[in-house]
């Protein structure tokens, strides 16, 4: 049996990278019947939130939710998880660059330590765990296809 999950993610930041910045991440699980369940997470104040940190945090949140769902199931189905993001950075991190960075000791082609290494490594570890029970696919979508997750991020930041 295959258990399918589709998760839409988004991250946002106000005051990107500056002192006093606020950020949030959201993940929206869309069920087969069209209904959805959503979660948000406020970013910590340190390191200062950025849009990129928010987008990777959203990926981590989605991976955590998928693993949590797998642990709740009575059976051990093959998991098929698709994570959607409107961030080309987040999708690139999870599909291409992460493998090169890991091989290069977390340095980029210019020899600089990669930004957001802590979150990217966390996402990589969660991805590895999910790969043990199924497949994870990362898909870029245009912003207008991600309105619910975007709205949830903004609501979270409004409440901070």
Walk through the language-model features, giving the residues of each.
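Short secondary-structure junctions and interdomain/linker hinges
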Residues: 130, 159-160
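Short, conserved alpha-helix that lines the donor NDP-sugar binding/gating region
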Residues: 55, 59
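RNase H catalytic domain
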Residues: 16, 61-153
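RNase H-like nuclease fold core
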Residues: 1-53, 64-71, 156-159
